[in-house]
């Protein structure tokens, strides 16, 4: 047996992984649980797949291809507009669209793929995006504090990590050497 490698079928003893049956009832209210401000919240946004028609009102999220191909998208309806932006694209491509976007969802396809962290920094620091910045795909609680430092303020949670783990991980970094998105100058914060 290698050290650090879980050998059992059920990973429930470590405190990070729980079976789906053990998840809190409020977690199951939305199709994809959403954590915002340290709590589960109901997702008010409707994700529109492909070329499906947009509803006349309500907040909608479209994919990047549709946003860039339809210049007037969202102008003839009430409700806010958001986009799912792939991590394979340069975040600067969103610059001409940011004035009409209230949400940008950045994809984290795997734990080892950090491109969305860089995109978030560009959106917040260089382009001045002030809307909701959502981590989608496969964000993990282990990344929570670092996602917030890059500017994320909402997380779609597809795994079985309970809210308590996310809250603990959000508070886990007590000293930092670089400024985060919403912090002032200073080399060390404690």
Language-model features: locations:
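N-terminal, charge-rich interaction modules
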Residues: 15-19, 25-70
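Hydrophobic faces of well-ordered beta-strands that scaffold small-molecule active sites
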Residues: 60-62, 79-83, 102-106, 131-135, ...
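Active-site-adjacent beta->alpha loops and helix N-cap segments on the catalytic face
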Residues: 67-71, 111-122, 164-172
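Glycine/Thr-rich beta-alpha phosphate-binding loop at enzyme active sites
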Residues: 80-123
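Glycine-rich beta-to-alpha transition loops that act as phosphate-gripper elements at the mouths
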Residues: 87, 130-141
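Catalytic cores of alpha/beta
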Residues: 92-96, 140-153
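Glycine-rich phosphate-binding active-site loops on the catalytic face of alpha/beta enzymes
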Residues: 152-170
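C-terminal helical cap(s) of enzyme catalytic domains, especially alpha/beta-barrels
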Residues: 164-189
